[in-house]
Amino acid sequence: MSHNFTESYDIIVIGAGHAGVEASLAASRMGCKVLLATINIEMLAFMPCNPSIGGSAKGIVVREVDALGGEMAKNIDKSYIQMKMLNTGKGPAVRALRAQADKEVYSKEMRKTVENQENLTLRQTMINEILVEDGKVIGVKTATHQEYAAKAVIVTTGTALRGEIIIGDLKYSSGPNHSLAAIPLADNLRDLGFEIGRFKTGTPPRVKASSINYDVTEIQPGDEKANHFSYTSRDEDYVKDQVPCWLTYTNAESHEIIQNNLHRAPMFSGIVKGVGPRYCPSIEDKIVRFADKERHQLFLEPEGRDTEEVYVQGLSTSLPEDVQKDLVHSIKGLENAEMMRTGYAIEYDMIMPHQLRATLETKKISGLFTAGQTNGTSGYEEAAGQGIIAGINAALKIQGRPELILKRSDGYIGVMIDDLVTKGTVEPYRLLTSRAEYRLILRHDNADMRLTEMGREIGLVDDERWARFEIKKNQFDNEMKRLESIKLKPVKETNAKVEELGFKPLTDAVTAKEFMRRPEVSYQDVVQFIGPAAEELDEKIIELIETEIKYEGYISKALDQVEKMKRMEEKRIPANIDWDDIDSIATEARQKFKKINPETIGQASRISGVNPADISILMVYLEGKARSISKNKEKQNHV
């Protein structure tokens, strides 16, 4: 079939949400000519749901995106109205940063970045069709019948694919925030042979700030101590005049209103068909599932400095508008609240992610990548993490360079992608710290140590940032060596100081590092014995040193597990393997192998329903095949 291409690009990204902007920025910064196509330019990097970035596990993803050279962390550091470190009373593995965003500023700042990026064209247009020939992407076709050539296409359409908004018995075609739905593109993906799922998410009502009685709610201020998402941000730029959030609760009256109107709730009347998120359920779902709970938390979150809109976090609903008003007015502090926007549910198509490789390229079509909610995830941060990986790998593919696959031990982004492509998902996927088996080495404080070198090799970390990183890494390494080399001996003067600080005296000589392993001993305590470092250390480096030393035993065990898994990941499975040729593996394992087509022994071992015996049989089979190929080569060489 002949095509009339009017423009040509290396990569075309469809959708300018949080996945799309990261994908397009990464690819263009790597030297590719990129088109970022969006249905509505005004919604670039928009926040149709909660006005925040970060949180448990998610905040670590934002730092990983930053370490690789992405934009989300820098952008939220320019647009937050409140910053808070979560789980400070718990161990370092679960600590994470969360920022309340000024959603308009966030979107505008990201748009400035996109518009000023070299090699990147931003255009408002609707893509209706992905053009494919001989199993390869060749371009796209727009709603206005324009055809653009491309070597790779990245689909990051969020909830727009055949999107439908639902409020009570009202249901209409729409993308997020009442934008246009991408129906022809959804049809096109089905026609291309992809297995499509149907998911659902939702959003709560927004209320007017001046109509809230804050006196009967609990204030939730931000942190005074400076924290940032981006490693490039400076403490002196930390916002001091932060905007508080407020805490209130549902009550018996709220629950009664919901119970009395369940017959009108789309969730229970049969109107909603899509599968909703387990970890962010609607309020009506919570009331039914947790009927024994007397109340549920609700956070009143301002959507920005220059707007009256307040997001009622925890009150996601698709109940009819009149019921929503009664529900809002039953809540303490919201008795006279003016509802500015109605909550709604949105159903949308998504691609079942077992059809993807770990690069986020589809197995079916070469050069076609997908990222974000299109792959069945929920959340801006999960979208950004996938977006940057899809953008990087699309660029690497057309440049003929080795692909980037983040392992589960590299970062939460690696955990997420491996979960998606190996296990799939039957509901909107949300990242949790419990999903990561190596979470003690995937911390908020060490994302740069884990991933900056990768970002540099790819070409996304510039010279200035690399120089700063090298200084930090050298300072960290040098101080760790110093702490290992200096010994504290149990002599009278030393023990006198030890006891003066309130610690048990030394009985044997120990290194400064060993002394610091004591739970009660801080880095500053140790400095009193050995003196300060040659260079003054930043507080963040000191925190990193303390964590690495105090949790060294656990970290060491985790790294041993990583090495074992690495050996399994290095054992590749041929792409053309005939799974029916392998005798003795269980029927369930054979079915799963055919469906997912794992690329390594490590990936195969993580598929649900596959047991160790199946893996052993698979390894024996592959070793036998390798020997057979080797013998055939020897025979040919003798001929």
UniProtKB/Swiss-Prot annotation:
NCBIfam families named among the record's database cross-references: mnmG_gidA
Function: NAD-binding protein involved in the addition of a carboxymethylaminomethyl (cmnm) group at the wobble position (U34) of certain tRNAs, forming tRNA-cmnm(5)s(2)U34.
InterPro entries: FAD/NAD-bd_sf, GIDA_C_N, MnmG, MnmG-rel, MnmG-rel_CS, MnmG_C, MnmG_C_subdom, MnmG_C_subdom_sf
Protein name: tRNA uridine 5-carboxymethylaminomethyl modification enzyme MnmG
Gene Ontology molecular functions: flavin adenine dinucleotide binding
Family: Belongs to the MnmG family.
Originating organism: Streptococcus gordonii (strain Challis / ATCC 35105 / BCRC 15272 / CH1 / DL1 / V288)
SMART domains per record: GIDA_assoc_3 (SM01228)
SUPFAM superfamilies for the chain: FAD/NAD(P)-binding domain (SSF51905)
A Pfam family this chain is assigned to: SAM_GIDA_C
UniProt subunit comment: Homodimer. Heterotetramer of two MnmE and two MnmG subunits.
One annotated Gene Ontology cellular component of this protein: cytosol
Positions contributing to FAD binding: G15, A16, G17, H18, A19, G20
Domain of life: Bacteria
Main location: cytoplasm
BP-aspect Gene Ontology terms: tRNA methylation; tRNA wobble uridine modification
Keywords: Cytoplasm, FAD, Flavoprotein, NAD, tRNA processing
UniProt binding sites for NAD(+): 276-290
